[in-house]
Amino acid sequence: MDDQNRNLILATGLSFVVILVWFLLFPPPEMVEDPNAIPPAAETGGVETDTGIALTPPVTVADAPAGADTTAPSEVALSEAARIDIDTPAVEGSISLLGGRIDDLSLRNYFTEVDGDQIVRLLSPVGSDDPYYALYGWTPSGDLGYADVPTSDTPWELESGTILTPDSPITLAWDNGSGLIFRRTIEIDDRFMFQVTQSVENTGGAEVNLAPYGIVARHGLPSDLQNFFILHEGVVRKVDGELSELGYSDLPDLDIIAREGVPAEVMEVETNGWIGFTDKYWMTTLIPGENQSFVSVVKYVPSAEIYQTEARLPYMSIAPGETAEVTTQLFAGAKEAEAIRDYENAEPGLIASLFGAEQDASRGEIPRFIDSIDWGWFYFLTKPLFWLLHWLNGAIGNMGLAIISLTLIVKAVLFPLAYRSYVSMAKMKELQPEIEKLKESAGDDRQKLQQGMMELYKKNKVNPAGGCLPILLQIPIFFSLYKVIFVTLELRHAPFFGWLNDLSAPDSSSIINLYGLLPNPAPEPESIMALIFIGILPLLLGISMWLQQKLNPAPTDAMQAQIFAWLPWVFMFMLGSFASGLLVYWIANNTLTFTQQYLIMRSQGFKPDVFGNIRSSFKKKAKEEK
């Protein structure tokens, strides 16, 4: 087998190995409800543990009669309590006066379907199909109990404001009737950030100690859970400068902490941390105040299948006649890189600055918030590639063309490596006849063959590994490009041309709809039919890989020839259900690689006979059939 074919097998084999290892190490989680699950901690008065960590009250979940449907349409759930509307350019929804929950939030600029008019619902109330909400409150201590502080079912009253907008905050109030008046002022900006100020006024005659907290709770798994090995979905948090992640499947396996009564993980944060849930495109995150210490808690309540993140702040002493307050933030929205970077208030960096990114100091400072986007292992490559793609999309106005342009730029940058690789391959091609003679003369004496080949390489100043190293160096860049295209929010519902109206979805064309000529939908990506009725892009991908093979004659070994003959079509079916934006990248990359290799090989005196190799493969196949 010549070295050029060996390099191609090496690159293909490495891709297969990486995919297989990922699936073996990180299989999709299988969530099975435990019938013997431990119930959440019971409500008690005066909760301050011997560790000094305050406990939050369990979230109230209404009981349903046996055999009843435990979910209800969101409209019904929303009507069960008085509400205050939310109205901003980016989001719409409402806040429930029952518990003061932020539990109804939809994203105005994002739709569930490409041609649909239903906007994405991020947060939903208890009683709906997918309850997901943020809740705030106070943990009591001493003689105070949970009846003395606001909890998840406290009836708040609207004290000021009418509708929550970027220009008009609202204030909720609740008097416990025992000398404590609680207030909650909620503000929102024009993107996705809430600011929640909790205060307590002590009108009684004794000092009280209370600990504020925030909760983000999710009942059950997300309906749009991707479960894809290169994407993190679940808990994301920053603890003293370090980013920590837990998948949804990890939470039930956490150790059961006695004081929590359920599987949980507790971390103390000295300053500038945050915690919440992240999905592929959306995120809901609690952010305590700047330089605020707190306890970061992740837990799972098996009895109700609730995934929960909490930020518990230290106890505060409130003397008679005094008022204490604490301010936290809540991010609930789309993972728009520019918005998240602005909230981080980070300098964009050289690469991002070159492509139009600017610092916005008006939105606070949340350290490492940009890392809530899953940049992957090669983040140092993924980030600049993302900003370049983002800039190209803005400049060109078409994400498909931006992907092709990005591929072209990366190919240009990597040209020196590719040139060395292909020159080395061309030189090895020239030596192939002499290598064959050495094999014949050496026979079964492998030591003699190796010695003769090394002398031949030395005489002709050829490095046999010269074609492999550039390929290996390009692998991290390949994975970074793959990651960028996979996680980029701008790819969602982004059109290219013709039938390609969503680059984040698989190619919708198939023989069923005459490849886009008929309005019939393509098979679901998860179905077996999708493997059979593949679209135009997977076909083009297979053809581009097949043509790339034809730059070289087929291997003389029959087994190797069969493997090479099947590889393009195996990849065509394997990758057919991937996002069409990824296929656009792979097709563009294969086309540019073919062109580069053809021109470089010709410049070195080796003239690839593409059409001759194609004819030869068909003649060989016809002979085998006879």
Curated annotation (Swiss-Prot):
GO terms for cellular component: plasma membrane. It holds the Pfam family 60KD_IMP. The keyword Chaperone applies. It is found in: Cell inner membrane. GO terms for molecular function: membrane insertase activity. Its main location: membrane. Keywords: Cell inner membrane, Cell membrane, Chaperone, Membrane, Protein transport, Transmembrane, Transmembrane helix, Transport. GO terms for biological process: protein insertion into membrane; protein transport. The keyword Protein transport applies. The chain crosses the membrane at residues 8-28, 399-419, 469-489, 527-547, 563-583. Interacts with the Sec translocase complex via SecD. Specifically interacts with transmembrane segments of nascent integral membrane proteins during membrane integration. HAMAP family: YidC_type1. Required for the insertion and/or proper folding and/or complex formation of integral membrane proteins into the membrane. Involved in integration of membrane proteins that insert both dependently and independently of the Sec translocase complex, as well as at least some lipoproteins. Aids folding of multispanning membrane proteins. Belongs to the OXA1/ALB3/YidC family. Type 1 subfamily. This is Membrane protein insertase YidC. It comes from Jannaschia sp. (strain CCS1).
